[in-house]
Amino acid sequence: MPSAVVHPDVSVVITFHREGLLAHKSLLSLSRCRAAAERAGVGIEIVATLDRADAETQRIVRDFDAAGKPDVLLAVDVGDLGESRNNAIAHASGEWVLICDGDDYLSEDFIVRCVQSAGKYDERTILHPELIVMFDGWAAISWQPEDNDPAFHADCMLVCNPWNSCSFARRTTYTDVKYVRARPGESGFGYEDWHWNCETHAQGYSHRIASGTVHYVRKKSHGSLNQAHADGHALIHRTKLFDIAP
Protein backbone atom coordinates (compact mmCIF):
# COMPACT_ATOMS: atom_id res chain seq x y z
CA MET A 1 0.00 0.00 0.00
CA PRO A 2 1.47 3.41 -0.96
CA SER A 3 2.37 5.80 1.83
CA ALA A 4 0.32 8.97 2.26
CA VAL A 5 1.31 11.86 0.00
CA VAL A 6 2.45 14.94 1.94
CA HIS A 7 1.29 17.44 -0.68
CA PRO A 8 -1.26 15.64 -2.87
CA ASP A 9 -2.34 16.97 -6.23
CA VAL A 10 -5.82 15.46 -5.95
CA SER A 11 -8.03 14.76 -2.94
CA VAL A 12 -10.58 12.06 -3.68
CA VAL A 13 -13.67 12.65 -1.52
CA ILE A 14 -15.83 9.58 -1.01
CA THR A 15 -18.83 9.26 1.30
CA PHE A 16 -20.04 6.08 2.98
CA HIS A 17 -23.31 5.36 4.75
CA ARG A 18 -24.77 1.84 4.54
CA GLU A 19 -23.03 0.38 1.50
CA GLY A 20 -21.82 -2.76 3.28
CA LEU A 21 -19.84 -5.08 1.00
CA LEU A 22 -20.29 -2.68 -1.91
CA ALA A 23 -17.87 -0.30 -0.17
CA HIS A 24 -15.09 -2.86 -0.66
CA LYS A 25 -15.62 -2.88 -4.43
CA SER A 26 -15.59 0.92 -4.60
CA LEU A 27 -12.33 1.05 -2.66
CA LEU A 28 -10.85 -1.51 -5.05
CA SER A 29 -11.84 0.80 -7.91
CA LEU A 30 -10.06 3.68 -6.17
CA SER A 31 -7.03 1.43 -5.69
CA ARG A 32 -6.73 1.01 -9.45
CA CYS A 33 -7.26 4.73 -10.02
CA ARG A 34 -4.63 5.64 -7.45
CA ALA A 35 -2.07 3.25 -8.90
CA ALA A 36 -2.61 4.65 -12.40
CA ALA A 37 -2.36 8.22 -11.12
CA GLU A 38 0.86 7.58 -9.24
CA ARG A 39 2.39 5.94 -12.32
CA ALA A 40 1.60 9.19 -14.13
CA GLY A 41 3.20 11.27 -11.37
CA VAL A 42 -0.06 12.50 -9.84
CA GLY A 43 -0.14 12.48 -6.03
CA ILE A 44 -3.40 11.28 -4.49
CA GLU A 45 -5.02 11.36 -1.07
CA ILE A 46 -8.35 9.73 -0.26
CA VAL A 47 -10.63 11.51 2.21
CA ALA A 48 -13.60 9.41 3.30
CA THR A 49 -16.55 9.98 5.59
CA LEU A 50 -18.59 7.46 7.55
CA ASP A 51 -21.87 9.27 8.09
CA ARG A 52 -24.04 7.28 10.49
CA ALA A 53 -22.61 4.20 8.81
CA ASP A 54 -23.74 0.74 9.85
CA ALA A 55 -21.32 -1.66 11.53
CA GLU A 56 -20.60 -3.65 8.37
CA THR A 57 -19.70 -0.56 6.34
CA GLN A 58 -17.50 0.78 9.13
CA ARG A 59 -15.65 -2.53 9.40
CA ILE A 60 -15.03 -2.81 5.66
CA VAL A 61 -13.80 0.77 5.23
CA ARG A 62 -11.63 0.77 8.36
CA ASP A 63 -10.07 -2.63 7.61
CA PHE A 64 -9.43 -2.08 3.91
CA ASP A 65 -5.69 -2.41 3.31
CA ALA A 66 -4.83 -1.68 -0.30
CA ALA A 67 -4.02 1.43 -2.34
CA GLY A 68 -7.59 2.69 -1.99
CA LYS A 69 -7.38 2.81 1.80
CA PRO A 70 -8.51 6.27 3.00
CA ASP A 71 -5.69 8.54 4.15
CA VAL A 72 -8.20 10.60 6.11
CA LEU A 73 -11.24 8.86 7.60
CA LEU A 74 -13.90 10.99 9.28
CA ALA A 75 -16.74 9.64 11.38
CA VAL A 76 -19.52 12.22 11.14
CA ASP A 77 -23.07 12.37 12.44
CA VAL A 78 -24.92 14.66 10.05
CA GLY A 79 -27.20 12.31 8.12
CA ASP A 80 -26.78 14.34 4.96
CA LEU A 81 -24.73 13.66 1.83
CA GLY A 82 -23.97 17.31 1.05
CA GLU A 83 -22.81 18.10 4.58
CA SER A 84 -20.71 14.92 4.62
CA ARG A 85 -18.94 16.13 1.49
CA ASN A 86 -18.44 19.59 2.95
CA ASN A 87 -16.83 17.99 6.02
CA ALA A 88 -14.49 15.93 3.88
CA ILE A 89 -13.54 18.87 1.65
CA ALA A 90 -12.67 20.91 4.75
CA HIS A 91 -10.09 18.21 5.61
CA ALA A 92 -8.76 17.86 2.05
CA SER A 93 -5.34 19.27 1.13
CA GLY A 94 -5.11 18.62 -2.62
CA GLU A 95 -5.18 21.37 -5.21
CA TRP A 96 -7.97 19.45 -6.91
CA VAL A 97 -10.95 17.54 -5.52
CA LEU A 98 -12.77 14.59 -7.05
CA ILE A 99 -16.26 13.83 -5.71
CA CYS A 100 -17.48 10.24 -5.79
CA ASP A 101 -19.94 8.00 -3.95
CA GLY A 102 -19.37 4.90 -1.85
CA ASP A 103 -21.02 2.37 -4.16
CA ASP A 104 -19.88 3.53 -7.63
CA TYR A 105 -16.80 2.77 -9.74
CA LEU A 106 -14.47 4.84 -11.93
CA SER A 107 -12.49 3.92 -15.03
CA GLU A 108 -8.86 3.12 -14.17
CA ASP A 109 -7.33 6.27 -15.70
CA PHE A 110 -10.17 8.54 -14.52
CA ILE A 111 -8.02 10.77 -12.29
CA VAL A 112 -5.18 10.98 -14.82
CA ARG A 113 -7.57 12.09 -17.55
CA CYS A 114 -9.18 14.66 -15.26
CA VAL A 115 -5.82 16.21 -14.43
CA GLN A 116 -4.85 16.26 -18.10
CA SER A 117 -8.16 17.83 -19.12
CA ALA A 118 -8.00 20.40 -16.32
CA GLY A 119 -4.77 21.76 -17.76
CA LYS A 120 -6.67 22.91 -20.85
CA TYR A 121 -9.07 25.15 -18.94
CA ASP A 122 -9.06 28.05 -16.50
CA GLU A 123 -9.47 27.79 -12.74
CA ARG A 124 -13.24 28.20 -12.87
CA THR A 125 -13.90 24.99 -14.77
CA ILE A 126 -15.67 21.93 -13.40
CA LEU A 127 -15.12 18.58 -15.10
CA HIS A 128 -17.61 15.73 -15.37
CA PRO A 129 -17.34 12.14 -16.64
CA GLU A 130 -17.88 11.73 -20.35
CA LEU A 131 -19.82 8.47 -20.17
CA ILE A 132 -22.20 7.21 -17.48
CA VAL A 133 -22.76 3.45 -17.33
CA MET A 134 -25.70 2.49 -15.11
CA PHE A 135 -26.00 -1.05 -13.80
CA ASP A 136 -27.60 -3.31 -11.19
CA GLY A 137 -31.28 -2.29 -10.76
CA TRP A 138 -31.43 -1.30 -14.43
CA ALA A 139 -28.92 -0.86 -17.24
CA ALA A 140 -28.32 2.16 -19.45
CA ILE A 141 -25.58 4.39 -20.81
CA SER A 142 -25.58 8.14 -21.31
CA TRP A 143 -23.19 10.84 -22.43
CA GLN A 144 -23.01 14.07 -20.46
CA PRO A 145 -23.04 17.48 -22.18
CA GLU A 146 -20.73 20.45 -21.97
CA ASP A 147 -22.38 23.76 -21.19
CA ASN A 148 -20.85 25.36 -24.30
CA ASP A 149 -22.53 22.82 -26.57
CA PRO A 150 -24.94 24.62 -28.96
CA ALA A 151 -27.60 22.07 -28.00
CA PHE A 152 -27.30 22.90 -24.29
CA HIS A 153 -29.46 25.58 -22.69
CA ALA A 154 -29.33 26.37 -18.99
CA ASP A 155 -33.12 26.59 -18.84
CA CYS A 156 -33.18 22.79 -18.92
CA MET A 157 -31.84 22.83 -15.36
CA LEU A 158 -35.23 24.00 -14.15
CA VAL A 159 -36.58 20.49 -14.74
CA CYS A 160 -33.54 18.20 -14.95
CA ASN A 161 -29.95 17.82 -13.80
CA PRO A 162 -27.60 17.57 -16.80
CA TRP A 163 -24.61 16.29 -14.78
CA ASN A 164 -24.46 13.57 -12.18
CA SER A 165 -22.82 13.72 -8.75
CA CYS A 166 -19.26 12.94 -9.88
CA SER A 167 -17.23 16.12 -10.45
CA PHE A 168 -13.61 17.30 -10.52
CA ALA A 169 -12.52 20.88 -9.84
CA ARG A 170 -10.16 23.00 -7.81
CA ARG A 171 -10.68 22.63 -4.07
CA THR A 172 -11.52 26.33 -3.84
CA THR A 173 -14.53 25.72 -6.10
CA TYR A 174 -16.07 23.47 -3.45
CA THR A 175 -15.19 25.76 -0.56
CA ASP A 176 -16.63 28.78 -2.39
CA VAL A 177 -19.81 26.95 -3.43
CA LYS A 178 -20.74 24.47 -0.74
CA TYR A 179 -23.30 21.70 -0.95
CA VAL A 180 -26.62 22.49 0.70
CA ARG A 181 -28.40 20.31 3.23
CA ALA A 182 -30.91 18.11 1.41
CA ARG A 183 -33.30 16.23 3.67
CA PRO A 184 -36.65 16.04 1.87
CA GLY A 185 -38.28 14.24 4.78
CA GLU A 186 -37.65 17.28 6.98
CA SER A 187 -37.78 20.26 4.64
CA GLY A 188 -39.07 19.08 1.27
CA PHE A 189 -35.75 20.06 -0.34
CA GLY A 190 -33.40 17.53 -1.95
CA TYR A 191 -31.04 16.92 -4.87
CA GLU A 192 -27.92 18.60 -3.50
CA ASP A 193 -25.93 17.80 -6.68
CA TRP A 194 -28.54 19.35 -8.95
CA HIS A 195 -28.58 22.48 -6.80
CA TRP A 196 -24.76 22.65 -6.75
CA ASN A 197 -24.64 22.40 -10.54
CA CYS A 198 -27.19 25.23 -10.83
CA GLU A 199 -25.31 27.43 -8.36
CA THR A 200 -21.91 26.96 -9.97
CA HIS A 201 -23.31 27.59 -13.45
CA ALA A 202 -25.07 30.74 -12.21
CA GLN A 203 -21.82 31.98 -10.68
CA GLY A 204 -19.92 31.70 -13.94
CA TYR A 205 -18.20 28.34 -13.59
CA SER A 206 -17.85 26.34 -16.80
CA HIS A 207 -18.97 22.71 -16.93
CA ARG A 208 -16.83 20.60 -19.25
CA ILE A 209 -16.17 16.92 -19.93
CA ALA A 210 -13.00 15.01 -19.06
CA SER A 211 -12.51 13.14 -22.30
CA GLY A 212 -12.39 9.36 -22.09
CA THR A 213 -13.66 9.07 -18.50
CA VAL A 214 -16.33 6.58 -17.43
CA HIS A 215 -18.41 6.65 -14.24
CA TYR A 216 -20.11 3.35 -13.38
CA VAL A 217 -23.23 4.19 -11.38
CA ARG A 218 -25.13 1.63 -9.37
CA LYS A 219 -28.89 2.05 -9.86
CA LYS A 220 -30.42 0.34 -6.88
CA SER A 221 -33.80 -1.33 -7.26
CA HIS A 222 -34.70 0.12 -3.88
CA GLY A 223 -33.15 2.21 -1.12
CA SER A 224 -31.31 4.80 -3.24
CA LEU A 225 -31.08 8.40 -2.07
CA ASN A 226 -32.26 9.78 -5.41
CA GLN A 227 -35.29 7.51 -5.32
CA ALA A 228 -36.06 8.67 -1.79
CA HIS A 229 -35.95 12.27 -3.00
CA ALA A 230 -38.22 11.44 -5.93
CA ASP A 231 -40.67 9.50 -3.75
CA GLY A 232 -40.79 12.46 -1.37
CA HIS A 233 -41.52 14.85 -4.26
CA ALA A 234 -38.45 16.86 -3.23
CA LEU A 235 -37.57 20.21 -4.78
CA ILE A 236 -34.12 21.72 -5.13
CA HIS A 237 -33.31 24.68 -2.91
CA ARG A 238 -33.70 28.15 -4.33
CA THR A 239 -30.84 28.85 -6.71
CA LYS A 240 -29.35 31.99 -8.22
CA LEU A 241 -29.76 30.42 -11.65
CA PHE A 242 -33.51 31.05 -11.48
CA ASP A 243 -33.50 33.90 -8.98
CA ILE A 244 -36.13 36.04 -10.66
CA ALA A 245 -38.45 36.48 -7.67
CA PRO A 246 -37.79 38.98 -4.85
Spans of features found by a protein language model:
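A conserved acidic beta->alpha catalytic loop
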Residues: 29, 47-60, 101
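Glycine-rich, basic loop-to-helix element that forms the pyrophosphate-binding segment
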Residues: 76-92
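Acidic donor-binding loop at a coil-to-helix junction in glycosyltransferase catalytic cores
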Residues: 187-196
